[in-house]
Amino acid sequence: MEDRQKRLIDEAKALLEQGKVSWVIGYEPGSLKFTTTPLITRDKEDINRLVINPFIINNLSNFLTELEGRVAIVAKGCDSRSIVSLIQDNKVNRDNVVILGLPCTGVIDLAKIEGLVGRERDEIDDITLKDDKVIVTIAGKQREFPTSEVLCDNCLSCEMPTPEEYDILLGQPVKPSPLATPDKLKEMPAEARWQFWQREFNRCIRCYACRSVCPACFCQRCFVEETEPQWLLPIPHWQDNLLFQVARNIHVVGRCTDCGECERDCPVNIPLRSLTREMYGLVDELFQYKAGMDKEAAPFLTAYEVEEAEDLIR
């Protein structure tokens, strides 16, 4: 990890010093223990703050559309898929991006760690990711857990741990080994599932954090802000909250890479990934299409053939 971090710092500094990029986007230590925060800088002195650790959870691709000039960006496998999707939609010019690809074995869900050890983060001395296990140190005593119990849910089903689109690869490639994760919601009767979502969206405060953090949400004006016609009331009733999420999922279908940012960023912990993952699976099943895999491919539902299966368009 330290070797990769040193190389990242060296590469990023060189890119800035040689004038090959105007900006560098990566991760720096967060203000809270065992966290990181995005680092966006054009100052080479800031580059020393760049880190690589098991807590680099943010999908940084969202920032590419906000910066002018050539940008170097640290990208895990899922992040690189989001970048490719933005390239496909002409939201990002590939020539203006230097992708510092980061092979990834998964990032740690701190809430899972706290639940397993029954302690808050401030009571934990150290968390180390090593091969297929995580070592947690508390008061000098170590406890080990398999990664399947502590990684973020989207990491467990990751199909691209190593970016396929990159300019510089930081480390050795990691082979994909997605785990089958049960979907308890799909096993529920339809009525119970409906009641579940009614309860969940009754808690939604309509803060739009899910929209703001999503790389696939890039409309200049969102439908929820329209007043003629007005699609949703500004007061967060559960019916309008549900409509917002259904419409948002339809809008990003074929662009969602299952990065899990929408669910992670939700302040009231609504399991939004259950919705996006369902749409992701349907696109794969019906159209054999996965977002962000090929920058040369046409965006989803923008290319048609005479031989197109008729049962899908009736």
Region roles according to the model:
Residues 1-197:
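Iron-sulfur-associated redox domains of electron-transfer enzymes in respiratory
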Residues 9-10, 198, 208, 250:
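Residue-level marker for well-ordered alpha-helical positions
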Residues 81, 212, 273:
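Glycine-centered loop/turn positions within well-structured domains
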Residues 175-202, 216-314:
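Ferredoxin-type iron-sulfur electron-transfer modules in oxidoreductases and energy-metabolism complexes
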